[in-house]
C-alpha cells in the first residue's frame, strides 16, 4: 500500500513475486486471481508485501526514491547473522536509542529449538550471555527495560550475572505459568518459568495491565465511585475534600463541582440544576452523607474511568468507576500465557511445518513488551535471539490493536530465518488470523521491514576458494616445507581473492 501505482504493472508481471505470494498468502485461491496477475488484483489486495529481492537493482532504487523518509517509514529491521555481530554492527546507528530489549535465550536444557548448542556447561552459558548482555547495554536509552526469559536451570546464574554486570538497576523476577500441565521432573513438576525485568532503580518504568481485554481472565473492577466501606472511614467528615457534586447531562458526566461547604447538606443523592443538569452527591442508600473515593483535586485524573448509571428502580443516578488498568502481579498465571495453547498452536496455524516446538505464547511476549515500554505506543524493541519471530509478531499485534508505532529489530543466525522468521512476519502483516497456513481474512496493516545478512569470520573461512598448481601440491608432501608454506603463502596468496579484499572496495556495491 506504500508503493506508487506506477510500479504495479512491473509487480504484476514478476513471476518470482507471484510464486512467493502463493506460498505465503495462497493468493491462487482468491476469486480474482489470474496468471499473470493484474493491476486491479494488486489494487484489491493492498497489503501484499513485495520483496525487492525479486526485482532489478535499478528498479529497486527507483522505487525507494519515491518513498519519503524511508527510515521513518520502516517498521522493522531483521538480521540473518550471529547476534553478537549484529549488536556491534548496529551500535553506530542505535547507540542509546533502544527503549527495550527482550530476549529468550537458550535455557541450557536438553531440548530446545534454538540453534546454539543446548548442553552448555554453566560457565559456557554464562559466557555466551555475558558477552551479549554487556555489549547490548550501549544500545539502551537512560530510561530502559531489559527483559530476559529463563527457566530454573540457569535462573540463579542469570541473576548473579545481572548483579555483577549492571549497577544502579532493579531486577524484578516474574514467574510465568507457561506449562499448566507441568513438566516431568524427579521431585516437582515445573509449571512456570521466569522473566527478569531489569530497569534503572528509583523510577516508574513498568506499564499497567489492561483488564479490558476480553481474552484475559482477570476482569475490570467495577464499583461505585462512592466509598462503600463500613464505619467512620466512609463518612463525609473523614475527608471533607471528597464531598462535592458531579454534574451529568443526558446521561454523561460533564463537570465536577467544588468541594461543598461544611454547613451545606443536600436533600438527596440527586439534585436538579439548570438546563437539564443533574448534580450527583456521594450519599449512601440510607441517606447518610458519604464521600467519593477521590478528592476533588485528583478525580479528574480518572475521568475516562467514570460513567453515569441510572437505577430505574430507585429513580436516581449514581457515578460508577470502571478500573481497567492494574499493576502487573509478580505471578502471571492467566491461561493466555500457555506456551502450548498460545505459542505452538498459534505458530502452527500460521506455519504448519515449522520446526519450532516450544515457542513463547504470543501474549507472554506482547505483555512483556507492553509492560516494558510502560504502555507507550512507540519505542524500539530489540530481540537478538529472535527464533520464530514471536517478538516481531507481538509488536505487530500491539500496533494493530492501538495504531501504535513500535519498531522491532531482530537478529537470528539460524537457517530457518528464510523459512520461519521472515515469512512469519510477512504473513501476520497480511492477516491477523490463520488456519492451516492460510489467511482467514485480509485485515492487513501497512508495514515495511528491511532485512540484511551479515557475513561472519567463520562464513568467510567457509567460502575460501584455493587455487594450487601441481608443483605447489608436491611441496606439501615435505612436512617442514608444508608448515612454512601454510603460514606464509597460502593465506596471503592462494586465498587472497576469497578473503576480504580491500582492493575490491573501489566498487563496494560490486564486491
Language-model features: locations:
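Short acidic/His/Gly/Ser-rich catalytic and metal-binding motifs that mark active-site loops
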Residues: 107-114, 339-344, 462
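Conserved P-loop NTPase mechanochemical-coupling segment
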Residues: 62-78
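Accessory, often C-terminal, charged low-complexity segments
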Residues: 1-57, 75, 91, 95, ...
Amino acid at each position: 500500500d506504500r508503493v506508487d501505482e506506477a510500479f504495479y504493472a512491473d509487480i504484476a508481471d514478476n513471476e518470482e513475486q507471484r510464486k512467493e505470494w502463493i506460498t505465503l498468502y495462497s493468493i491462487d485461491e482468491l476469486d480474482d486471481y489470474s496468471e499473470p496477475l493484474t493491476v486491479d488484483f494488486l489494487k484489491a489486495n493492498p497489503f501484499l508485501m513485495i520483496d525487492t529481492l525479486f526485482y532489478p537493482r535499478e528498479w529497486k532504487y527507483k522505487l525507494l526514491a519515491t518513498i519519503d523518509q524511508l527510515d521513518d517509514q520502516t517498521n522493522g529491521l531483521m538480521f540473518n547473522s550471529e547476534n553478537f555481530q549484529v549488536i556491534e554492527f548496529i551500535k553506530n546507528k542505535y547507540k542509546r536509542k533502544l527503549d527495550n530489549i527482550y530476549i529468550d535465550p537458550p535455557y541450557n536444557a536438553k531440548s530446545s529449538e534454538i540453534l546454539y548448542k543446548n548442553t552448555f556447561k554453566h560457565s559456557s552459558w554464562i559466557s555466551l550471555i555475558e558477552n551479549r548482555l554487556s555489549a547490548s547495554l550501549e544500545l539502551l536509552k537512560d530510561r530502559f527495560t531489559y527483559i530476559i526469559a529463563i527457566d530454573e536451570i540457569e535462573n540463579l546464574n542469570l541473576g548473579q550475572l545481572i548483579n555483577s554486570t549492571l549497577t544502579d538497576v532493579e531486577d524484578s523476577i516474574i514467574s510465568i505459568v507457561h506449562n499448566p500441565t507441568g513438566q516431568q521432573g524427579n521431585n516437582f513438576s515445573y509449571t512456570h518459568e521466569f522473566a527478569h525485568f531489569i530497569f534503572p532503580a528509583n523510577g516508574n518504568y513498568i506499564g499497567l495491565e489492561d483488564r479490558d481485554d476480553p481474552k484475559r481472565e482477570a476482569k475490570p473492577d467495577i464499583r461505585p465511585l462512592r466509598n462503600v466501606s463500613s464505619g467512620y472511614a466512609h463518612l463525609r467528615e473523614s475527608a471533607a475534600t471528597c464531598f462535592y457534586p458531579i454534574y451529568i447531562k443526558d446521561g454523561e458526566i460533564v463537570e465536577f463541582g467544588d468541594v461543598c461547604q461544611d454547613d451545606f447538606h443536600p436533600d438527596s443523592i440527586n439534585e436538579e440544576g439548570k438546563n437539564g443538569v443533574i448534580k450527583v452527591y456521594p450519599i449512601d442508600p440510607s441517606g447518610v452523607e458519604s464521600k467519593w473515593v477521590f478528592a476533588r483535586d485528583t478525580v479528574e485524573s480518572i475521568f475516562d474511568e467514570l460513567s453515569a448509571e441510572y437505577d430505574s428502580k430507585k429513580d436516581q443516578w449514581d457515578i460508577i468507576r470502571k478500573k481497567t488498568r492494574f499493576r502487573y502481579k509478580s505471578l502471571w498465571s492467566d491461561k493466555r500465557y500457555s506456551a502450548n495453547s498460545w505459542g505452538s498452536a498459534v505458530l502452527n496455524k500460521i506455519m504448519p511445518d515449522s520446526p519450532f516446538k516450544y515457542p513463547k505464547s504470543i501474549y507472554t511476549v506482547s505483555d512483556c513488551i507492553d509492560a516494558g515500554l510502560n504502555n507507550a505506543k512507540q519505542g524500539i524493541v530489540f530481540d537478538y535471539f529472535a527464533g520464530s519471530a514471536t517478538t516481531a509478531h507481538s509488536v505487530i499485534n500491539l500496533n494493530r490493536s492501538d495504531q501504535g508505532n513500535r519498531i522491532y529489530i531482530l537478529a537470528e543466525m539460524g537457517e530457518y530465518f528464510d523459512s520461519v522468521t521472515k515469512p512469519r512476519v510477512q504473513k501476520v502483516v497480511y492477516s491477523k488470523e490463520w488456519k492451516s497456513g492460510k489467511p482467514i481474512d485480509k485485515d492487513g496493516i501497512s508495514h515495511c521491514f528491511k532485512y540484511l545478512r551479515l557475513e561472519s569470520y567463520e562464513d568467510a573461512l567457509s567460502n575460501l576458494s584455493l587455487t594450487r598448481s601441481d608443483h605447489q601440491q608436491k611441496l606439501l608432501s615435505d612436512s617442514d616445507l608444508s608448515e612454512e608454506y601454510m603460514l606464509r603463502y597460502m593465506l596471503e596468496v592462494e586465498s587472497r581473492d576469497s578473503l576480504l579484499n580491500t582492493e575490491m572496495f573501489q566498487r563496494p556495491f560490486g564486491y
